[in-house]
A protein has these predicted regions:
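Short, charged, surface-exposed hinge/linker loops at domain edges
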Residues: 1-4, 39-97
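Structural detector for hydrophobic anchor residues on beta-strands
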Residues: 4, 16, 26-28
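Short, charged low-complexity linear motifs
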Residues: 4-6, 33
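Short aromatic-glycine-(Arg/Gly/Cys) micro-motifs in beta-strand/loop hairpins
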Residues: 8-23
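Hydrophobic aliphatic residue packing
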Residues: 18, 27, 82-85
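Short glycine- and Lys/Arg-enriched binding-loop motifs that mark or flank ligand-binding interfaces
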Residues: 21, 26, 51
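A short, exposed loop/beta-hairpin motif centered on an aromatic-Gly-Thr core
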Residues: 24-35
């Protein structure tokens, strides 16, 4: 199973937001961190399915080290929580076909 790094933004008085640096437009939210991460797993699966159905490729995940070296992502990695969200390999195989 492949895992994507997700940025979990938790601010007092706001919903918890989750986004994926490697997957533009793939976002989720929830009232709690656990709920937001659960929703992120669902969002990732739906996002990947839409990409496959649209004939588009799914970008490979970067490692945490690679993301830390990205000047656009590094500040968010330092400020927010990070989670690894799984994507079934079957979706990646379909994307490659």
């Amino acid at each position: 199973m492949t895992h994507y790094v997700a940025i979990v933004e938790e601010e007092p008085g706001k919903a918890v937001g989750v986004w994926f640096p490697d997957l533009p437009g793939c976002i989720s939210a929830g009232d709690t961190v656990d709920e937001a991460i659960d929703h992120a797993a669902q969002a990732l699966k739906l996002w990947a399915e839409a990409m496959v159905e649209g004939g588009q490729s799914i970008p490979p995940p970067r490692t945490l080290t690679e993301l830390k070296a990205d000047p656009e992502i590094a500040p968010d990695l330092a400020r927010y929580m990070v989670a690894l969200v799984p994507l079934p390999d079957s979706l990646l195989r379909h994307a490659a076909e």
